[in-house]
Amino acid sequence: MKIMKKYIKTAFFCSMYWLIVQLNIANLGTRIPDKYFRQKHIIFKSFNFEKHGKFWNKWFYVRKWKHKILDGHKLNRNIYDQRHLMTINIDEIEKMIIETKRAELIHWISILPVIIFNKGPRVVKYINIFYAMIANVPIIIVQRYNRPRLTQLLRILKRRGERHD
């Protein structure tokens, strides 16, 4: 019984830890100025193996499950609400590209707090590593899938000169 109480207590504290840490990281991430994401950073570059996002769909079937991911705006009002994408124009697509970069960065950073469990019991460490990966990697994959497609759409719109609808 004591062992069960200990596991329940540990699970509760780990859950509270992740809730507080991830909400704070998301909140801080929404405060990063857009100009940071307009610059070309290597971490947001689409690499050759990604084949403009096709890699992610081929190996992870992103199109089948990406719509099931909870919209971050429902948890944090500072997160860009994708429902505002009513029209497809240069300004909106540029904003969406910025937000894919922001979301990817936030989720990469959200994995890092798992290091606090490094000295803990093996089972606690593995459960928390698993949680950190399962909670963040799918969102990173979706951003890496969507961004090259949005970038291609942006190029097409710029060629047509469609600044506003």
Swiss-Prot record:
The chain crosses the membrane at residues 126-145. Keywords: Acyltransferase, Carotenoid biosynthesis, Cell membrane, Membrane, Signal, Transferase, Transmembrane, Transmembrane helix. Pfam families: CrtO (PF18927). The keyword Cell membrane applies. It is a single-pass membrane protein. One of its GO terms (molecular function) is acyltransferase activity. It is found in: Cell membrane. Its main location: membrane. Belongs to the acyltransferase CrtO family. Catalyzes the acylation of glycosyl-4,4'-diaponeurosporenoate, i.e. the esterification of glucose at the C6'' position with the carboxyl group of the C(15) fatty acid 12-methyltetradecanoic acid, to yield staphyloxanthin. This is the last step in the biosynthesis of this orange pigment, present in most staphylococci strains. This is Glycosyl-4,4'-diaponeurosporenoate acyltransferase. It comes from Staphylococcus aureus (strain MRSA252). The gene is crtO.
